[in-house]
UniProtKB/Swiss-Prot annotation:
Full protein name: Probable cytosol aminopeptidase
Record family assignment: Belongs to the peptidase M17 family.
Source organism of the structure: Prochlorococcus marinus (strain SARG / CCMP1375 / SS120)
Catalytic machinery residues: 269, 345
Cofactor dependence: Mn(2+)
Residues engaged in binding Mn(2+) 1: 262, 341, 343
SUPFAM superfamilies (alphabetical): Macro domain-like, Zn-dependent exopeptidases
Record keywords, A-Z: Aminopeptidase, Cytoplasm, Hydrolase, Manganese, Metal-binding, Protease
GO BP terms, alphabetized: proteolysis
Amino acid sequence: MQISLYQKNLADWTGSIIAVGLLEGQIQEQLSLLEEICDYDSLLTHVEEKDFSAKAGELIKLEILGKSLEKIILIGLGKPEALSIDDLREGAALASRASIGSKGKIGILFPWEPFNPISASKAVAEAMRLSIFKDLRFQSEPKPQNNPQSIDLIGLPESNHNIIKEVDPICSGVELARELVAAPPNELTPAALAEKAVEIAKKFKWNYKILNRKECEKEGMGAYLAVSQGSDLEPQFIHLTYKPNGQIKRRIAMVGKGLTFDSGGYNLKVGASQIEMMKYDMGGSAAVIGAARAIGELAPVDTEVHFIVAACENMVNGSAVHPGDIIKASNGTTIEINNTDAEGRLTLADALIYACKLEPDAIVDLATLTGACVIALGEEIAGLWVESDELANELKDASSACGEKLWRMPLQASYKEGLKSMLADIKNTGPRSGGSITAALFLKEFISNGIKWAHIDIAGTCWTDKDRGIDPAGATGFGVRTLVNWACKSNPDIEK
């Protein structure tokens, strides 16, 4: 998809379809901009006949209205006083989906004025591309959809063309994350995930390590290895390192939960626990690896980035960990496993300890960790646990700039009582109430003093069963764009 900015006279624009974003109460005024490229009177008549009022999400298509145009798509953006950049994203996604099957150039004419042109152009360009992603890899006779190939964002300064160049690597990272999450577990094994990570490292000439079981044993990673011991597939501990040219002013680590399949172990997932969907329990690692793909192209200035994933399966066999087992993490902490289906936090424990040994300024982990977070925040908002206000603000700025929603949750210290074990230093789960908070408190136990840390629970946001905003049904790639914005915040062209 080729996306360009067009600021010349609209009468000189050549294309077959134009999508116009309209506001309630301003329809006639806004449509007057089209007088030079279509039969304006006929257009108004059609709008009245369709009873179009520009309510948010409303869409109509009007065929062949004169001159070179074949179609006009009108999209409602809602009330002008409530217009947000998220409304532009939603409108762009509708326009892109409505244009599937069209061969000519498409123009997007939205009310840009209230917004920073860099923010608006990037938001709409990303939405146009990401909303029509389709994964055809596993169909025996795939029928590719005819996506629009050429799009002009009309009325935006052409001097901002550099920001459009950033859209391709970012969207490529999101699309990679979507493909990783959507891949079935017989295809995306821990080894396959490691291979994809190594492919990225080699492409950008980064340093990397892939630790096998014996190497993890030498590191004392008893928590991670306990989860993996019920699977015939070898665990793969992944570590990629991006180092910028010039002075390094900041060092950060991104840690992703990498359960390529989670049966629940002996606390087997049954009934509504959707065991058939547990391929997406590596959504955190997909976000981290997708971010690595984008960061390789965007090359953050002055920031060193570490990408860490403890990849494995949680399966059941004669060697699998038992409920009630006591294991030891690589920092010496003993853990009583009172639920084998709370395995992600065990793999993350050793991954976070490993990350802390690198002495970064900050660590962010992403994980499909708890159903409790889904109950609390639903499927559009991820939970954010963080003590540092500075890091919280960095992540909230990074997420709001790209439309990924985070909600800061409490690290209520008193809830740690629920993790007390009679025999070990800590249990891996607490009581049912406050489950997402106790999960975050468990992870906090493995963070070294002086290192800023944030935990993002993406259990609800990494998958959608139906089209939702810029996300088509399936894997969303949630978290990639937030991580990229956070890592690249010093880059001159990256939106702050």
